Each structure stands twice: as structure tokens, then as C-alpha cells.
Regions:
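Short, flexible active-site loop motifs that bind/organize anionic cofactors or intermediates
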Residues: 7-10, 27, 44, 83, ...
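Hydrophobic core positions of alpha-helical segments in small-molecule transporters
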Residues: 14, 60, 135-138
């Protein structure tokens, strides 16, 4: 039987959802994790994160926490390898995951930066970089979704760190 986890945020679900909606709409339309930072900071604080934690975690997350980009690069690389007629082994797929994860850490939080890193992952896997043109036309739509996933991870991290810090402070006080 699974144990039910306590809520990370102390606010009601409807008000928390409206705050998240604002930042997700802005992130989706701008496709920029860095551009979303001001809205993200204020909304994350409204959700219950400490200002000090949010001010540290969110800019760091906007720089290196690119979950959506890592997932996209893996899926796009496997898709483009299949389009080339390549059959990937398990070892090659693991290499793609590791390379895409490392590349996503170095990706800038600006629109379109993931495509540049995707070219690097394709080259590392000996897939013709020209194949990137197959997905280039729809990448902007994917970029919007990736940004929403990236900032959701940043928000979750800030709320979890606040919760853990509060628990640690309470344990230290005893």
C-alpha cells in the first residue's frame, strides 16, 4: 500500500492552479525559461515557497534544469535515427540519453536553443545533422511545451526545498 504524501503547497488547489495557469501561459507563449523568471518568482512565492529559496532555485533551474529539453532531444534523436533507417541498440539508446541529458544542462533558456544542442547529439550518434530539417518546422510548437515542462520542474523544486528546509529547521529547533 502506497503512503499518501503531504501537500507541498499550503494554499487551496483553485488559487494555486490559477497562479500556475498564469505562468504556464506566459511560458508557453514566450518559449523562454529565463523570460518567465519574474512571473515564476512571484507565483512560486504565492504558492508558499520562501523568497530566499525561490530566488536561488528558480534562476538556477532556468539555467540548468531542462527536463523537457532532455526528453525532447532523446525522442527526436531516436525518431531521426529511425527516419535514416538506423536500428539503435540498447547501448546506443543509453548513449543518447546520457548525451541529451548533458547537452540539455548546457542549453540556454531561450527560444530555439534546444535545436542547436540537438544537432550536437545527432552528430555524436553519427546521424546526419541535415535530418534536423525534418522537425525544424514544428520545433517552435515543441519548444513551447518543453518550456512549460522546464518551469514546472523549477517550481516543484523550489516548493520541495522550502518544505525540506522547514522540516530541517523544525528538527534543529527541537
Amino acid at each position: 500500500r502506497m503512503r499518501r504524501l503531504p501537500p507541498v503547497s499550503t494554499r487551496g488547489r483553485s488559487s494555486a492552479a490559477s497562479d500556475v495557469d498564469k505562468r504556464l501561459i506566459f511560458a508557453f507563449s514566450s518559449a523562454s525559461s529565463v523570460g518567465t523568471l519574474p512571473i515564476n518568482l512571484s507565483c512560486t512565492e504565492k504558492l508558499g515557497a520562501k523568497k530566499e529559496v525561490a530566488s536561488f532555485v528558480l534562476p538556477l533551474g532556468a539555467t540548468i534544469n531542462m527536463d523537457g529539453t532532455a526528453i525532447y532531444q532523446c525522442v527526436a534523436t531516436i525518431f531521426l535515427a529511425t527516419c535514416c533507417g538506423m536500428t539503435l541498440t540498447l547501448g546506443q539508446m543509453v548513449t543518447i540519453v546520457v548525451t541529451a541529458t548533458l547537452a540539455s544542462i548546457g542549453t540556454a533558456g531561450t527560444p530555439g536553443a534546444g535545436m542547436i544542442m540537438l544537432a550536437m547529439v545527432l552528430q555524436a550518434m553519427n546521424i546526419p545533422v541535415d535530418m534536423i530539417m525534418i522537425i525544424y518546422g514544428v520545433d517552435r510548437l515543441f519548444d513551447m511545451g518543453r518550456t512549460c515542462l522546464n518551469i514546472t520542474g523549477d517550481i516543484s523544486c523550489a516548493l520541495c526545498v522550502t518544505k525540506w528546509e522547514s522540516k530541517k529547521t523544525a528538527q534543529t529547533a527541537k
